[in-house]
Structure formats: C-alpha cells, structure tokens
Design a protein with these regions (language model features):
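Beta-lactam-recognizing serine transpeptidase/beta-lactamase-like catalytic domain environment
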Residues: 2, 9-59, 64-315, 358-364, ...
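Hydrophobic, aliphatic-enriched repeat segments that assemble into extended interaction scaffolds
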Residues: 7, 11, 327-328
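Helical mechanochemical/support elements of P-loop NTPase systems and associated helical scaffolds
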Residues: 202, 319-322
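Short, gly/Ser/Thr-rich active-site loops of penicillin-recognizing serine hydrolases
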Residues: 230-239, 322-388, 393
Length: 403
C-alpha cells in the first residue's frame, strides 16, 4: 500500500502517478466484488493515495522548515544547534540518531544526518519570532508553506485531491485556547509530524521547488490535446514561492549529503547525481510509514519524486530505493543495480497488513481465535480420558451390606 508521484520540475508535467493496491476495472462488473471493493476500509483499493491520501511527511519536510526559517530571518546558513541525543525541554525528549552529539551542528550536516533536534529548535525559533505574540511567527511560516502549494488544493487538471493541513495560529487558538499554546506544544511540526499533513503530490511538488530554487508549475497530467501543446496559463505560468532563490543552495547541498554521508548512502550510485531526503512517518495504527523525496540530476533536474510505502518502516527500507531506481531509469534510460531491484521485488509487508486486519476484527468483536482441531482437539480428549481413568482406578470400592 502506498503511492509514488513523479514530476518534471521544468514544466510541472506529472510523469508518474501510482497508487496501491490497484484494482482491475472488470471487477466492478461483479456485484459482490464491487461491493467488497467499495466497502474495504482497510486496504481501500478505490482510494487514490497519490492525490487524496494525506500523511505526515516526516523528515522529508525538514528542508521546508529550514527554508521558512531562512526566509523569516530566524536562522541563517551558519546557524548551529547542539543535539543532546535529541531535543529536550523539561520532561519532553524527542530522540535522535544523527550521531553528532554535544557539539555544534550546521544546517547542511543536519539535513544529511536528519537531526531531529536541529529542526525542532529551528521550528521553535520560527514560532518565537515575536516572543510576545506567537501568532506572528506561525502565521508567517504558514504563509510561506502555502506558497509551496501546501495546505491547499494544488489546482491540478485531475478531478480529485486533498488540501492536507498546515496549521495556523487560529487552528491552535481553537484547540488550546487563545494565548494558551506555546512552541513546545507544537514542536513536532518542525520535523513534519505533529499536525502537518501532505499528499504525495504535494511532497513531489515541494521537491520540484527545491530543484528549481524557488518556483514551480502547477502539476498537470495533460501534455497535449489533439496533438496541440497545452496553452492554458494555469499550467504554463511559473509560480514563485515566498522564499528567495539564494536560500536553496545550502538545502540542495544537504540533500546531496543524504546520499554521500547520510541516511541514503547505502543506495547511492555513480550512474547519476541524486539529491534526496529520507522520512519515517509515525503511525499510530501500525508500523511506521516509509517515505522518500528525490530530484535528479544535478544539472537542470529532470525529475522530482515522492514515494510513500505505508507501514514500510524506515525511509531507506522501501521508499528510498524505489524512488532512486525510478530516477535512474528516467535519467539514464537503464538500471545498473539489479540486486536492488530484486530486493524491492522480494519485499513483502503482508505480515504487517495481516496483523492490522486481525486488530480491526478484534476491535469490531468479530475475531475468532483459530483452533487446530486435529492436534489440539485430540490431545484434550485424551487428557480427559486419562483423568477419568485415573479417577476410577483410585476410587474406593463400594461395600454392599446384606440384609
């Protein structure tokens, strides 16, 4: 289960749009199958995850946090934070595995190693831009993210979609009460968790924006009509974000670090230069989701990809290798990593999905524990027999009195 979206950063054309599980349209001809497909609330095969599915983007969102901070002036390219095995505030502790502890760490390195502390502190400073009014910082942050197409409909030429969620001060005033909340209550937003929700299409689009250093074209699937190129200005006019182009260079270097010395170094390749970011999205209903965003090549990027595998665990487990292989085939017209292809083909998450199905049945009170009748049933019967025979063996004889 999951989705993959690939865009051409140069024009916004959707190169690939995949959602799984897939269905055979002919199944709708069968009344029983049609009903089963529509009512399947677990696998949801009729649900377009690429356009409608909303997920916390996890660490793939950290670059966007940094870009907002750079534009707002709450941090610079030289800003460092000290990771103490994660972010700490009072009794709160957000763990981190960046490996660079108790020493100043810069932005470029923090992206490569995916330091949770760095982007938590960066987000805290964003919200605290005006220490006397947190709404100033969070609303400016939200406006910048809206300019990336986040928190609103993308306006594609497809009939469905989701806005996702980018929270504002009003959102938290309604939840906690006006003036009650503070940066620490919403700190997980900085890492793409908390209340952040995006679609795979939106993730691919903000990756294209980073590739373009600040602009994008509205994603669309139509290339031409009756052989004539698309002329609709909705899809042909460049849209600039609120982030200055100068802030994107360090972000791109950090995304390259992800492959050279960071979390994706296990599937880097010499065939082409790729820039990416791993993500692991926490999921309260089962194993974490595996996410990855990528653009390539270095000179005039041709493709931007977002991949999510539901319950796929780490971003490097499934989503990362899948995105990298797609980019390799598109950029080089060949794949030189057959072992990685085979590993993806052999991957299987049916055990995790089966566990979720059993949990669902238990919540509904419909689960029946399986019983192996041949082995367990006979064993129980034999035990009963032995117990009865033992009882008879030691039972005292009755004495009948004669009249």
């Amino acid at each position: 289960r999951g989705a993959i979206v690939a865009l051409d950063p140069n024009n916004g054309e959707i190169l690939a749009l995949a959602s799984a599980p897939t269905i055979n349209p002919n199944d709708y001809l069968n009344t029983k199958l049609r009903s089963a497909l529509i009512n399947d609330s677990i696998a949801r095969p009729t649900y377009d995850r690429a356009l409608q599915g909303t997920y916390p983007p996890g660490s793939t969102f950290k670059m966007v946090t940094a870009l907002a901070g750079l534009q707002m002036g709450t941090m610079t390219e030289k800003t460092t934070y000290v990771c103490k095995h994660g972010f700490r505030y009072g009794r709160m502790h957000i763990g981190c595995h960046c490996g660079m502890y108790y020493t100043p760490q810069g932005l470029e390195h923090a992206i490569g190693k995916s330091c949770n502390n760095y982007f938590s502190e960066a987000y805290r400073d964003i919200v605290r831009k005006d220490p006397n009014d947190y709404s100033v910082g969070i609303n400016e942050w939200a406006s910048i993210l809206n300019s990336f197409g986040l928190g609103k409909f993308m306006g594609t030429d497809l009939p469905v979609g989701s806005k996702g969620l980018i929270p504002t001060a009003e959102f938290y005033d309604n939840r906690f009460g006006e003036g009650v909340w503070n940066p620490y209550r919403i700190i997980f937003n900085g890492m793409g968790q908390g209340d952040i929700n995006t679609t795979p299409l939106q993730m691919a689009n903000y990756t294209a924006i980073i590739a373009n250093k600040g602009f994008f074209y509205t994603p669309h699937i139509v290339h031409s009509i009756d052989g004539k190129p698309l002329t609709d200005s909705t899809y042909m006019v460049k849209k600039n974000t609120l982030v200055d182009p100068k802030h994107f260079d360090i972000i791109q270097r950090g995304m390259r670090n992800v492959f050279t010395m960071g979390t994706a170094r296990s599937f880097d390749t010499s065939s082409f230069v790729q820039f990416g970011k791993t993500g692991t999205s926490q999921n309260s209903h089962g194993q974490d989701h595996s996410l990855f965003v990528l653009f390539a090549p270095a000179d005039k990027p041709k493709i931007a990809i977002a991949a999510i595998v539901e319950n796929g665990s780490w971003g490097t487990t499934y989503a990362g290798p899948m995105a990298s292989l797609i980019a390799e085939l598109y950029v080089t017209d060949t794949i030189k990593r057959p072992a990685l292809v085979q590993r993806m083909k052999n991957g299987n998450l049916q055990g995790e999905y089966r566990r979720q199905w059993i949990d669902y049945l238990k919540r509904k009170g419909l689960y029946v524990e399986p019983v192996k009748k041949d082995s367990i049933g006979n064993k129980i019967d034999s035990l009963k027999f032995k117990k009865d025979s033992t009882k008879l063996k030691h039972e005292p004889k009755q004495i009948t009195k004669r009249n």
